[in-house]
């Protein structure tokens, strides 16, 4: 509990005065993260130009905008891993985590699908699969950078841009 509080930016006192269990703390962290992800995704999609000169330009613009809106604490990759591990270990917390992840995924898929449709863009894979691929790329890049003591944004951005440009380019 102390490590999760510390990594998530909560004090130990805040935990004891606001949460009755580790699961409640974890659910609150997930709720806060949900709102940030959906807001950044929606704002990014709404701000994207109607046309692009290349799939690389489209990917660069989308990823830069999204990451600028997502400026999360550098500790988030560790917090995220801790939350997933807690869900794996805790039968009680697992449904909360799975519900949160599915809800975010569904909303991101809807926003991303609409943005692609409005711009006449298509992917070579279903949008949910593309979202999973980008989530995996982002996670690996974040952890790799973190392990090497580097800021995660640079590597994450480069890898996400490459993945999205490849998906858009193959479909284009």
Predicted regions and their residues:
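Aromatic/pi-system hotspot detector in well-structured domains
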Residues: 15, 30, 74, 83
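Helix-turn-helix
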Residues: 1-28
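Hydrophobic/aromatic-rich alpha-helical bundle segments in the mid-to-C-terminal region
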Residues: 94-98, 116-167, 171-172
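Short loop-to-helix capping motifs
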Residues: 21, 86-91
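Short, basic, alpha-helical segments at the C-terminal edge of helix-turn-helix-like DNA-binding modules
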Residues: 31-37
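Secondary-structure edge/capping motif, primarily at the C-terminal ends of alpha-helices
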Residues: 48, 84-88, 141, 145-149
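Amphipathic alpha-helical packing segments from all-alpha helical-bundle domains
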Residues: 38, 71-81, 91-118, 129, ...
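Hydrophobic alpha-helical connector segments
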Residues: 28, 41-75, 127-134
């Amino acid at each position: 509990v102390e490590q999760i509080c510390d990594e998530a930016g909560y004090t130990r006192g805040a935990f004891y005065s606001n949460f009755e269990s580790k699961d409640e703390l974890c659910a609150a962290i997930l709720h806060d993260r949900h709102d940030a992800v959906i807001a950044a995704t929606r704002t990014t999609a709404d701000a994207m130009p109607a046309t692009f000169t290349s799939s690389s330009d489209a990917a660069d613009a989308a990823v830069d905008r999204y990451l600028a809106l997502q400026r999360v604490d550098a500790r988030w990759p560790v917090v995220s891993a801790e939350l997933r591990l807690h869900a794996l270990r805790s039968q009680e917390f697992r449904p909360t985590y799975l519900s949160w992840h599915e809800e975010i995924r569904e909303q991101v898929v809807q926003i991303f699908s609409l943005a692609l449709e409005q711009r006449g863009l298509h992917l070579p894979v279903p949008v949910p699969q593309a979202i999973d691929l980008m989530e995996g790329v982002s996670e690996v890049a974040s952890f790799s950078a973190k392990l090497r003591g580097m800021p995660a944004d640079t590597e994450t951005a480069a890898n996400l841009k490459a993945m999205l440009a490849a998906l858009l380019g193959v479909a284009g």
